[in-house]
């Protein structure tokens, strides 16, 4: 039993015990019989309820319905495994943040963020994070509990995450930044090209069409290509590992690496737009590990959401 289930089980038992005390103190002749019924029937029911999947599915359904009814800015993240999606989320929300719900394929996070510090206006944000390597995990397994039911999607911002170096594990743990930099400093251009090719295989026009058909509605207001791990790129450039590229031209070099993906996303995005519905597209370079540029990509969508006077909870 999880900690949450144990807590609820204990609360149910306490409530039952309070009922026993109240019945016993009432002085009613039927009191002993009612207490016996509680002991024989209610406690086993509580035990079964606290450990049965059906019971918890019912609770989860109530919670999910409430989640969809609650106004929020909703983000949908798409990218290869190891590209930094979860790190990006935790960089913005805080490293200790935990998902509201997590499965083998999917997790989502919720938080409250300030729209502006002067008025103290805040809004709720919901961020979906899909695990693993298969694109189907992002599309076929898309949770209507978070992004809304088909035909009534609630997604406001879509992030396509790419990076210049994969996640590499050694002895069952991912390399830290220093170790990854050491690995990338040898045959740098070849390794970067290989990683870009992996993203090109993952973010293809056919998949993009499915992604947009999965998340699209008039609630979608922004699409962003997020180029992650720019800090690593700056460091290998400073080390002279990429001939002809200087620190002043790092951003341009990174944009050129993913120019084809940028074009594919723009084209897919244009196919779902209409004269009365414009989706803003941008390309942003970030470092999820040190936070560079991370707040901007989320805050731009939140500001656009607010400026368009969409329904938002103001506190």
For the regions a language model picked out, list residue spans one by one:
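Short, flexible boundary segments at extreme N-termini or domain junctions of P-loop NTPases and their
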Residues: 2-75, 284
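Short, conserved catalytic or adaptor-binding loops enriched in Gly and charged residues
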Residues: 116-118, 267-278
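Short acidic, S/G/P-rich loop/turn micro-motifs used as interaction or catalytic elements
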Residues: 83-84, 133-135, 164-169, 231-234, ...
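Conserved C-terminal guanine-recognition region of P-loop GTPase G domains, centered on the G4
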Residues: 146-153, 157-272
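Short hydrophobic beta-strand that contains or immediately precedes a catalytic carboxylate
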Residues: 77, 125-129
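Switch I (effector-binding) loop of TRAFAC-class P-loop GTPase G-domains
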Residues: 93-126, 134-138
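Conserved GTPase G-domain signal focused on the G5
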Residues: 84-85, 284-315
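Glycine-rich phosphate-binding P-loop
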Residues: 73-97
């Amino acid at each position: 039993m999880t900690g949450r289930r144990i807590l609820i089980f204990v609360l149910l038992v306490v409530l039952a015990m309070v009922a026993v005390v109240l019945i016993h103190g009432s002085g009613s002749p039927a009191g002993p019989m009612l207490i016996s019924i509680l002991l024989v029937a209610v406690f086993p029911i509580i035990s079964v309820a606290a450990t049965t999947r059906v019971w918890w599915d019912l609770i989860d359904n109530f919670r999910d319905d409430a989640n969809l009814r609650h106004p929020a800015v909703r983000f949908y993240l798409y990218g290869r495994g190891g590209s930094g999606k979860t790190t990006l989320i935790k960089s913005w929300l805080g490293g200790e943040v935990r998902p509201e719900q997590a499965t083998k394929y999917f997790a989502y996070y919720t938080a409250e963020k300030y729209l502006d510090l002067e008025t103290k206006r805040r809004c709720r944000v919901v961020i979906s994070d899909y695990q693993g390597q298969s694109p189907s995990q992002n599309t076929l397994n898309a949770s209507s509990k978070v992004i809304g039911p088909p035909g009534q999607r609630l997604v406001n911002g879509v992030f396509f995450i790419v990076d210049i170096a994969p996640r590499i594990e050694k002895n069952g743990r991912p390399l830290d930044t220093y170790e990854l930099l050491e690995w990338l400093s040898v045959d740098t251009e070849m390794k970067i090209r290989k990683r870009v090719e992996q993203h090109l295989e993952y973010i293809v026009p056919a998949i993009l069409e499915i992604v947009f058909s999965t998340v699209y509605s008039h609630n979608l207001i922004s699409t962003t290509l997020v180029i992650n791990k720019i800090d690593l790129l700056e460091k290998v450039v400073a080390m002279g590992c990429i001939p002809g590229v200087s620190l002043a031209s790092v951003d341009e070099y990174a944009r050129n690496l993913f120019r084809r993906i940028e074009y594919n996303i723009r084209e897919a995005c244009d196919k779902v737009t209409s004269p009365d519905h414009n989706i803003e597209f941008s390309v942003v370079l970030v470092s999820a590990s040190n936070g560079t540029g991370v707040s901007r990509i989320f805050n731009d969508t939140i500001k656009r959401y607010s400026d368009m006077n969409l329904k938002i909870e103001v506190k």
